[in-house]
Amino acid sequence: MYKPISLFIALRYLWNTHLPNFKKIITILSIIGISITTASLIIITSIINGSEKNFEKNILSFIPHLIITNKNQCIKKDQFPENILKLNNIKNISDLISKEIIVQSKNDISMAEVIGIDHTNYYNIHNYNIKSVLKTLKPGYYNIIIGKQLARKLNVFIGDRLKLIFLSNTKNFFSGEIFKQRTFKIINFFSTKKEVDYYQILMNKEDSLNFLNYSKDYVTGWRVWLKNPLSLNVNEIKKITHPLFLLDWTTQKGELFKAMKIEKYIMFLFLFLVLLVSILNIVVILTICTVEKQNAVAILQTQGLLNCKIMLIFIIFGSSTAIIGNILGTLISLTLIIQNDFLKFFINIFIDETNIPIIVIPYQIFFINITITLFTILSTLYPSWKAIQLKPSRILSNE
């Protein structure tokens, strides 16, 4: 006798040469549906992984993930909340001298952000590729390095001078002057090919303190860089830094990230609906099978086969479709990802030619396969349970 008997009978029910064409078509469609769902989930999840990594690398690496400051954005260094260093997600912290300003050239005017730097906080701008010219930002010379796109907008070149203007926190009662301004010399440009090229100006830290009327023991705040900025827990950090103000990267780029998350959830919803259709096909197959195999089930029961083993026949029968579909879908998705020319061609039909970042994470593939298989197994329980509710004496009495 074939053992295990439940597996042998289930596979015979799944596919044999005597199956009607209608059943074969439904079985094939169910396998195709689950294959498409699995392949789509793996491909889309991999693209989302790549997009998030690209977002983190090209955008979040050029802005601080957190800024700790106070209401006036001018705070003593000794007020630094040292408890924040205990958090595991902290990668780097440095003090910050920064101010939003107006920058004026002979030809144009624009808004910008000035940042004071020296060797102690060079890490914050290591992506700017200006280490070789950093030494030229000597204190007292009032030299600056500006983004190429900002220079293009202002129509200025190396050696030209810019007037930097900012709103002072204090107002002179007699003169009424509330703006402070100073002329700086451009000694170089930086180009990151990112958004910061349009608005950032770098200057020596001591010069920035003098320009902004800060004492040496004062800073604008502290820049915090996280190991994983996408898993930021703002509430936890707010408790530690209270009563100081906490500005996180979501205030600047949060809308873009929210849009990405909404798109991800919508895609998963559509794919879940595709999976639901495939699972309903499996339920239909099982229901038809239990009706057709009533006599066979009754005979197996009279022969002493346990109800749990009869249920197992139908569970294996239904879940086999999911397992085959998962294997095919995984192989198809990995083939398309590895040989991504077809995938890029297909995407570029709907979107202008662009580079699609793809990152495959093995545990996600495993999770997708397990989840789909579990959904399928759960969908087989009710038809399998109904199959063993039939009384053999009643069914066989008509034979």
From Swiss-Prot:
An annotated GO cellular component of this protein is: plasma membrane protein complex
Name of the featured protein: Lipoprotein-releasing system transmembrane protein LolC
A Pfam family annotated for this chain is MacB_PCD
UniProt xrefs under PANTHER family: LIPOPROTEIN-RELEASING SYSTEM TRANSMEMBRANE PROTEIN LOLE
> Record's InterPro entries?
ABC3_permease_C (IPR003838), Lipoprotein-release_system (IPR051447), LolCE_TM (IPR011925), MacB_PCD (IPR025857)
Ranges that cross the membrane: 25-45, 266-286, 312-332, 358-378
User: Is the Cell membrane keyword given for this protein?
Assistant: yes
Q: Membrane topology type, per the record?
A: Multi-pass membrane protein
Q: Give the function comment from the record.
A: Part of an ATP-dependent transport system responsible for the release of lipoproteins targeted to the outer membrane from the inner membrane. Such a release is dependent of the sorting-signal (absence of an Asp at position 2 of the mature lipoprotein) and of LolA.
- Say which family it is in: Belongs to the ABC-4 integral membrane protein family. LolC/E subfamily.
Signal peptide limits: none
Q: Where in the cell is it found?
A: Cell membrane
Lineage, top-rank taxon, reads Bacteria
Has keyword Transmembrane helix? Answer: yes
